[in-house]
Amino acid sequence: MNNLLLVALGGSIGAVFRYLISIFMIQVFGSSFPFGTLLVNVLGSFLMGVIYALGQMSHISPELKALIGVGLLGALTTFSTFSNETLLLMQEGDWLKAALNVVLNLSLCLFMVYLGQQLVFSRI
């Protein structure tokens, strides 16, 4: 299958997952903090680490990397939403939540990429 179609297919799945996860997190925790965006970014970062490590070890095809790594995870994770939600918190004067959002997204996402890679490298 053409890689462009695989990216489009993965992207449509990732976008739907992001939407459903965000709605679920608002229902569970409310809308005072962007937990949905945090969760999709952390989960997507972990999965990106796994996909990257598997790709480095030639255990997945370029087509699967296009489907999952570029398409699904590219649509699942979202830097633009993270940035907008952080700015909104700042504009509302909630500097603590804005700072917490930045620190949590950056530190947890970096750690999850590392963890995903280490999990794969230690098992294979």
From Swiss-Prot:
InterPro entries: FluC. Na(+) binds at residues 74, 77. The chain crosses the membrane at residues 4-24, 35-55, 60-80, 102-122. It is found in: Cell inner membrane. One of its GO terms (biological process) is cellular detoxification of fluoride. GO terms for cellular component: plasma membrane. GO terms for molecular function: fluoride channel activity; metal ion binding. It is a multi-pass membrane protein. Keywords: Cell inner membrane, Cell membrane, Ion channel, Ion transport, Membrane, Metal-binding, Sodium, Transmembrane, Transmembrane helix, Transport. NCBIfam families: crcB. Fluoride-specific ion channel. Important for reducing fluoride concentration in the cell, thus reducing its toxicity. Belongs to the fluoride channel Fluc/FEX (TC 1.A.43) family. This is Fluoride-specific ion channel FluC. It comes from Shewanella sp. (strain ANA-3).
